[in-house]
C-alpha cells in the first residue's frame, strides 16, 4: 500500500474530505443546539414550578 501524500494521518482523509466532514458535524451541532434551545424554552413556559 503506497502512501498518498494527500492523505492525512491517522484518518486517511484528504484535507478537502476532512473539511467537508467538519462542515457536516458543525451543521449537526447547530441543529441540535437549536432544538435544545426550543425544548428548554418550552419546558420553561409549560412548567408551573419554574415560574
Swiss-Prot record:
Chain residues that bind a bacteriochlorophyll: 22, 40
Q: Which residues lie on this side of the membrane: Cytoplasmic?
A: 2-23
Q: Which GO terms describe its biological process?
A: photosynthesis, light reaction
**Topological type in the membrane:** Single-pass type II membrane protein
Major subcellular location class: membrane
- Annotated coiled-coil segments of the chain: none
Listed transmembrane segments: 24-46
Enumerate the UniProt keywords alphabetically: Antenna complex, Bacteriochlorophyll, Cell inner membrane, Cell membrane, Chlorophyll, Chromophore, Light-harvesting polypeptide, Magnesium, Membrane, Metal-binding, Transmembrane, Transmembrane helix
Q: Periplasmic face: residue ranges?
A: 47-51
Q: Which domain of life is it from?
A: Bacteria
Which molecular function terms from Gene Ontology are attached? bacteriochlorophyll binding; electron transporter, transferring electrons within the cyclic electron transport pathway of photosynthesis activity; metal ion binding
- Which GO cellular component terms are attached? plasma membrane; plasma membrane light-harvesting complex
- InterPro entries hit by this protein: Antenna_a/b, Antenna_beta_CS, Antenna_beta_dom_sf, LHB-1/5, Light-harvesting_complex
Localization: Cell inner membrane
Q: Name one Pfam family in it.
A: LHC
Q: What does the sequence similarity comment in the record state about its family? A: Belongs to the antenna complex beta subunit family.
Q: Which NCBIfam families match?
A: pufB_517_ASD (NF040862)
Describe the task this protein carries out.
Answer: Antenna complexes are light-harvesting systems, which transfer the excitation energy to the reaction centers.
- Quaternary state and interactors: The core complex is formed by different alpha and beta chains, binding bacteriochlorophyll molecules, and arranged most probably in tetrameric structures disposed around the reaction center. The non-pigmented gamma chains may constitute additional components.
> What is the protein named?
Light-harvesting protein B-800-850 beta chain B
Instruction: List the source organism.
Output: Rhodopseudomonas palustris (strain ATCC BAA-98 / CGA009)
- Could you tell me the gene encoding this protein? pucBB
Amino acid at each position: 500500500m503506497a502512501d498518498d501524500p494527500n492523505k492525512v494521518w491517522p484518518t486517511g482523509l484528504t484535507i478537502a474530505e476532512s473539511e467537508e466532514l467538519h462542515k457536516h458535524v458543525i451543521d449537526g451541532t447547530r441543529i441540535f443546539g437549536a432544538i435544545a434551545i426550543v425544548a428548554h424554552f418550552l419546558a420553561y413556559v409549560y412548567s408551573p414550578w419554574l415560574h
